[in-house]
Every structure is written in C-alpha cells, then in structure tokens.
C-alpha cells in the first residue's frame, strides 16, 4: 500500500522560514568545531518539485492515541540547501586548538605548558565558505511510533544517504573538495541516525496532550500579551484525562450557555457546535435540507423517451434482483403494453378509409328497376365529389341508353352484359359481392316522386330521368329502388 504526498502544499515561505530556523538551531547546537570560525547560516532552502515516496510495509498498532508503523522511504529529487560560514585556513591554529581540547578543564595549565609557542604562526586566518548540497538521494526503512503522552519517535534501520552532490568555493582545489565531500557525507549520515530523531521527538512534545495546556497558554500570551491568562480555564483543567473529549451532556449545557448570550441572530450556527460535529441541534436540519435537493437536471428528450427509461429501470431492477437472489426464482414483473391505444386508433382509421372508399362513386347515374327483376340499369347524372379510387379495384361500366329503347330491350342488354365473360377472377368475385349487397339494399327503400325527397335520403345525390311507360305505372307511382352511392352497378 502506498500514498501520494501533496508536495505543492509545502512550497510556502512560512514553512521554509520555519524549517530554516529549525536547521540553524540544529547545526549550531553543541560545541563548534575548531575548523569553523563562525556559525553556520542557511542562505537558501528549496524543497524542490519532486515529492518523496512512502510505502507502508506494516501497521503494528493503530488506535485513537497511539500509532506504530513500518515504512519504506525513497527520495531522489531536486531539493537543495545553501550554507554560508567562515573556516580556519591556518593549520597551526587548528592544531593548537585541537591539542588543548584533549585535556580536561582541570588540566588546562598542562596544555598551555606543552603546546608550542608560535608568535605569528598561530594567528587566525578566516576564509568565507559557501556550500551547496543538491542531488540528494535517500533510501531507507523507517519505523514511526507516535503516542499522545510520549510524542513521536523516528528510527532509521539503515543508513539512508546513498549519494549527495557537494559544491563549494574550494572545488578548484581537489584535495579540499574530496575532504569536504567525505566529511559532509559522514556528518549527514550521523544527522539522520541520531540528530534528526531527537529533534523530531523534542518538537513533537510541544503538540502532545501532556504539554497542550502550556502550548495553549504560550500561544495566547504571544497573541495577547496584555491579557492575564492565569485565570483562564482550559479543557485540560476540566478533564485532565481526556481534554479533547466532551460528553454530550456537557456540550448541550455549553450550547445553552453560548446561545443565551447571542442575540439578533437568525439561524446562525452556534459557536459551541463546532466542538462536536456529531451533535444534532435545531440548526442541523436547516443545513441538511438543502443537501437533499436534486441538483442533477435531466434533458427534455431524456424524460420524453419513456421506452428507454423503462428499459434502463428494468435492467437496474434485474441486476439488483439477481445480485440479492439466493435461489433461481425468476422476478415477477407487471407487464405493461405500450402503444395499444395507438394501434387501435390506426386500425379504426384503416376501417374508416376502406368504408369511405366503398362509398365512392365509380360512375355517375341512377338505378332503375322494374320490380320484377333483379337486374338494374343506369342513367346519366351529374358528377359527385369523390376520392380517387384505388387501381386495385375494377371500374364498372355504365349501360348506354337511347330514347327509343324500351324496358325489355334494356333488360335483355343487361342480361347479356351480365353473362359476359370476365377474365380477372377478382373482378367476378367483387361484382358478385356488390350484387348481393345491392339485392339486400333494394328490399327497403321505395321512392315516391310525388313527395319531395327527405333530408339525408340517397336520392339527393342523383337527378333521376323518369321513363313514362304505362306498363310500369302502378297507381301513379314508379317502383324505383335507389341504392346508396357505393353500389351504383
């Protein structure tokens, strides 16, 4: 398991200044070496742009107040640090100082007696030194142990330093450059092994539970030195064992006390609620309701596509059902037929169009019948508005009438026309069905021409020519039966 470090967050001047101050105190602590004439100062500190890599190898202990883990640490970045100091260039002066350091304080007089007394040879000769450390490559396995009561402990299991680049003002002098390279590598190895863990341990003591009250008082005194912080009550004074944990009852009392001194606040969040985010107050629901609003807007075409939505819902329900189903039972579904009304409407429209076509007139004329025969004749009449007939249906031919024709001649011609051979089989069947339908309709309507036609009567579509024949006159009425427009045959 590994994790990434947000390296950009540490590229701040405040952190760089704090780290430089911490390193200055660390480098100048203890007795200064005789080769140095002044303290070491950090001129420039850069963390670079490449973060280190941490890999978790083992988590031994993980609780609310303690942690123990083993990590693998690797770094090969572009961090750099520039140091400035002054070194002693007189070797006799360095020898004399090192000779005196071999004797203890009570033997100082003996050291002054045995050292050589050089007059001008032991004078101080200072040379400024600028030292830059870059191209640092580290790799090690570290153990981190943290406790609220004891602080942070860091241990390197091996030497973390693999390589480092040292550049100084003595690079042209090869012996001095090699000496500085070896000396700095040795010092940095000791720095990671001994000095760095002790610095981190002392620094972590300021932020643990034991020293939290002192740190809080120092912080208040730094921000407000004029205030008297001796009478201030802290969380450490209320509950020394667990200063950062407050019971719900105590928090409710603090909330009531805090709200009693707040006036003219409309729905504002009480300051005491920040101590425990798990508590539910009257303002909790005011913050929760806006979070339940649906912020995802759907397009109109997605909502209108009912079939696609139902298909998506069906797939989702099927996945949930089969995921939670322990047996092989099939899901029970309610079947909803879509588009049945539309299909029925289309069927009705088709039937109406067929009936409308049957009512269309293929030829113009009136129908005469002598009452004794089922054969009918046609006379010329005015045109009637009609829809264009389909080419699939045959067009019936009307019988040509002459003024000197009698009814018998018309009937005879009609009989011959009736027995005329028709080649298409479909035409014969269609004409036969139309004649059967005509016979059924001719059984009813008997038209009296002495009376005006009734509204809606089929005779209003025709201008009938009446043949005056004494043989077919029955009490002044002609036995005429008129068929509706679709059956003018």
Curated annotation (Swiss-Prot):
Annotated membrane topology is: Multi-pass membrane protein
The UniProt entry, under PROSITE patterns, shows: SMP
A GO BP entry is: phospholipid transport
Its main localization is mitochondrion
Its subcellular locations are: Mitochondrion outer membrane
Sequence ranges assigned to domain SMP-LTD in this UniProt record: 1-205
Q: Which UniProt keywords apply?
A: Lipid transport, Lipid-binding, Membrane, Mitochondrion, Mitochondrion outer membrane, Transmembrane, Transmembrane beta strand, Transport
Report the superkingdom from the record: Eukaryota
Q: Which GO terms describe its molecular function?
A: lipid binding
Q: How does it assemble?
A: Component of the ER-mitochondria encounter structure (ERMES) or MDM complex, composed of MMM1, MDM10, MDM12 and MDM34.
Question: Which PANTHER family does the record cross-reference, listed alphabetically?
Answer: MITOCHONDRIAL DISTRIBUTION AND MORPHOLOGY PROTEIN 34
- Similarity annotation: Belongs to the MDM34 family.
Question: What this chain does, per the record?
Answer: Component of the ERMES/MDM complex, which serves as a molecular tether to connect the endoplasmic reticulum (ER) and mitochondria. Components of this complex are involved in the control of mitochondrial shape and protein biogenesis, and function in nonvesicular lipid trafficking between the ER and mitochondria. MDM34 is required for the interaction of the ER-resident membrane protein MMM1 and the outer mitochondrial membrane-resident beta-barrel protein MDM10.
What does the record say about domains? Lacks alpha-helical transmembrane segments, suggesting that it resides in the membrane via beta-sheet conformations similar to those predicted for other outer membrane proteins and porin. The SMP-LTD domain is a barrel-like domain that can bind various types of glycerophospholipids in its interior and mediate their transfer between two adjacent bilayers.
- Record-given protein name: Mitochondrial distribution and morphology protein 34
Which source organism? Komagataella phaffii (strain GS115 / ATCC 20864) (Yeast)
């Amino acid at each position: 398991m590994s994790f990434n470090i947000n390296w950009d967050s540490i590229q701040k001047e405040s952190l760089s200044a704090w780290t430089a101050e911490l390193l200055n105190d660390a480098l100048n602590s203890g007795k200064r070496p005789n080769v140095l004439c002044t303290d070491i100062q950090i001129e420039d500190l850069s963390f670079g742009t490449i973060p280190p890599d941490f890999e978790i190898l083992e988590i031994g202990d993980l609780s609310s107040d303690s942690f123990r883990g083993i990590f693998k640490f690797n770094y090969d970045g572009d961090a750099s640090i520039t140091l400035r100091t002054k070194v002693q260039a007189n070797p006799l002066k360095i020898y004399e100082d090192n000779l005196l350091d071999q004797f203890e304080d009570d033997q100082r007089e003996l050291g002054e007696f045995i050292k050589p007394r050089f007059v001008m040879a032991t004078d101080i000769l200072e040379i400024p030194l600028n030292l830059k450390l870059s191209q640092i490559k580290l790799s090690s396995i570290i153990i981190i142990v943290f406790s609220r009561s004891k602080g942070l402990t860091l241990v390197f299991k091996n030497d973390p330093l693999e390589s480092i680049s040292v550049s100084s003002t003595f690079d042209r002098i090869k012996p001095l450059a090699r000496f500085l390279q070896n000396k700095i590598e040795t010092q940095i190895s000791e720095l990671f092994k001994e000095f760095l863990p002790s610095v981190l341990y002392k620094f972590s003591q300021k932020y643990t539970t034991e020293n939290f009250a002192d740190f809080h008082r120092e912080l208040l005194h730094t921000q407000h030195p004029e205030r008297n912080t001796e009478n201030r009550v802290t969380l450490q004074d209320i509950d020394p064992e667990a200063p950062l944990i407050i019971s719900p009852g105590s928090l409710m009392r603090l909330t009531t006390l805090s709200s009693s001194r707040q006036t003219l606040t409309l729905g504002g969040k009480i300051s005491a609620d920040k101590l425990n985010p798990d508590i539910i107050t009257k303002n909790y629901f005011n913050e929760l309701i806006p979070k339940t609003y649906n912020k995802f807007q759907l397009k109109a075409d997605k909502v209108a596509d009912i079939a696609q939505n139902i298909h998506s819902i069906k797939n989702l329900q099927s996945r949930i059902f089969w995921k939670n189903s322990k047996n092989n039972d099939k899901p029970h579904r309610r079947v909803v037929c879509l588009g049945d009304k539309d299909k029925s409407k289309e069927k009705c429209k088709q039937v109406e169009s067929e009936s409308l076509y049957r009512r269309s007139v293929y030829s113009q004329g009136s129908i005469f019948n002598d009452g004794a025969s089922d054969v009918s004749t046609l006379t010329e009449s005015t045109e009637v508005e009609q829809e264009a007939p389909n080419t699939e249906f045959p067009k019936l031919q009307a019988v040509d009438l002459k003024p000197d024709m009698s009814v018998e001649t018309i009937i005879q011609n009609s009989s011959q026309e009736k027995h005329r051979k028709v080649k298409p089989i479909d035409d014969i069947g269609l004409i036969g069905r139309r004649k059967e339908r005509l016979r059924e309709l001719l059984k009813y309507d008997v038209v009296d021409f002495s009376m005006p036609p009734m509204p809606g009567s089929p005779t209003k579509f025709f201008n009938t020519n009446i043949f005056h024949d004494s043989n077919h006159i029955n009490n002044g009425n002609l036995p005429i039966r008129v068929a509706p427009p679709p059956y003018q045959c």
